């Protein structure tokens, strides 16, 4: 069992963020990772579960042991019961080890009230026989002083040459140079880091966005009255302005993520903020001070801003005192802020020395495809594919943001179908930086070039030029023609268009792949422990046995293409012993699929619980090669598939990616209803990988 003990050199180094990122890095190596925070250190105002433990549980789907309370630990230390305390901690540590390859243990943070933290950390590291990784955050100090501070902490655990003291991770690095250049300069000034005994295991740059709380968090921490909640669950405060100036001087400051603080009687500022919100600027919110609220007639004029999601809060304190409170807000990650926790986790993981850490841990007992690994590999493979993906709904704000992310990270070469001025306006309003190389094509200017090719493709259906021109008024049809002519590699739509509007042009112009007679779909279900494939939950209402067999083969091929070993369960309400028309259909579909793909591991009919649960499988289907370990679930009809997908997703705390369409000659994918930026990014990545597999 490998154990990494994460020890801070000082207060405020961001220890929890490093723990989140380290667990993610180790998971990406296919390792089964446990986490353990032996001693809870609640922040002022914390009333729920211990923060680090709960955040790791929610972001990684693991269940760490509950930490000991700080009061209990201090009582035992005060009574001279250090040995008994360590025994208690080791018992909890053993729980964290069960079934895992490696355990990350988060040490105590030294505070004004816990000056003994360093001594306790030393005893913990030795008692757990752990390898120590120090975490430090550079202050405004010369590099030699930073090196000296780190070396002093390393001495507490046996010194930098002790084989159990691995190295240091530097967090919140504030510099204009790249992290690679900073690391090189640090090594030049630090003899400690020049050899292989004590390594620099990561440099994480300071990123203000990582500290941006939700507007809801701001309201709760201030005890503010919520006059209009709007989008306060989603919007984040990245900057604050105190309005004691004219409207003309305030307007340039009304940008994405800004919290505007002003007395409630400043009608001019309130109206200016409302106009900015109506024009699409996603402000963090409007905070009214001095316990004064605007006249109801003014609020009536703000109705459009309220409908646009502008949060409005009110506090009794004056603007100066409110500003002081805002500057002293607790910026720790709330345990229910999954979006921010995931962002920090991936950001930290991307700056750690993953190759060395993976090598240090060796080969896992059994490679596993966790959700974190699946998402990571999805992005990596899409980057390698380097495909050109067209987005017909090009001026939609969520799509513009997703396209900018994909372009900047090299996930895909995105093509937005929209007027460039519309995209620019969206980007300005939303605070989106459009990266170089992001293509924006005006449908009005390119529509004419596709009339003749479309007539040729549809001549068997007697399509003429005027009919083609009319259909090409739809940007989805233009995008589909671009795909048909190999100008792009894939298409993603459906944010505002219906599934039918996305799929119909593809069926007419792209058609099904060779060997396919139908188009079906799969969802990738990301559960805490594994990733499963569900098909078909979108396309085929009542498939025949032959169609169900084809869906099974398509779904197995999709699983294989995305790194999931396909073990296909053909789902039915009853086990193999029952006999009626529906069960017989599933049985026949299983036989047809086995005959068509003899290498495929497939079984059915199987009840869902027998396919998914090893204990039930041993009772209901002991001889099945799939029961209890299925990775691909094929449902007998659309009603069953769609209902199961939604119910299981909600009850099992799962996240679904998809639907991903399969069976088309070229990849076209429909976005799920209510898709957010992450959903769109992942759908673009899925499409890029499909395109690379198809080639």
UniProtKB/Swiss-Prot annotation:
Query: Which reaction is this enzyme known to catalyze?
Result: acetyl-CoA + phosphate = acetyl phosphate + CoA
Q: Name one GO biological process term.
A: acetyl-CoA biosynthetic process
Concerning Pfam families, the annotation shows: AAA_26 (PF13500), DRTGG (PF07085), PTA_PTB (PF01515)
| Region of interest (Phosphate acetyltransferase), ranges | 374-695
InterPro entries to which the protein is assigned, alphabetical: DRTGG, P-Actrans_bac, P-loop_NTPase, P_AcTrfase, P_AcTrfase_dom1, P_AcTrfase_dom2, Phos_Acetyltrans/Butyryltrans, PTA_PTB
Q: Which SUPFAM superfamilies match?
A: HprK N-terminal domain-like (SSF75138), Isocitrate/Isopropylmalate dehydrogenase-like (SSF53659), P-loop containing nucleoside triphosphate hydrolases (SSF52540)
| Involved pathway(s) | Metabolic intermediate biosynthesis; acetyl-CoA biosynthesis; acetyl-CoA from acetate: step 2/2
Q: Any idea which GO molecular function terms this record carries?
A: phosphate acetyltransferase activity
Question: In which domain of life is the source organism classified?
Answer: Bacteria
**Entry's localization field:** Cytoplasm
Q: Which UniProt keywords apply?
A: Acyltransferase, Cytoplasm, Transferase
Establish whether keyword Ubl conjugation is in the entry: no
- Spell out the CDD domains in the cross-references: DTBS
Enzyme Commission identifier(s): 2.3.1.8
Grouped into one coarse class, the protein's main location is: cytoplasm
Which GO CC terms are listed, alphabetically? cytoplasm
Q: Any domain commentary? A: The N-terminal region seems to be important for proper quaternary structure. The C-terminal region contains the substrate-binding site.
* Family, similarity comment: In the N-terminal section; belongs to the CobB/CobQ family. In the C-terminal section; belongs to the phosphate acetyltransferase and butyryltransferase family.
Q: What does this protein do?
A: Involved in acetate metabolism.
Report quaternary structure and partners.
Homohexamer.
Q: What's this protein's name?
A: Phosphate acetyltransferase
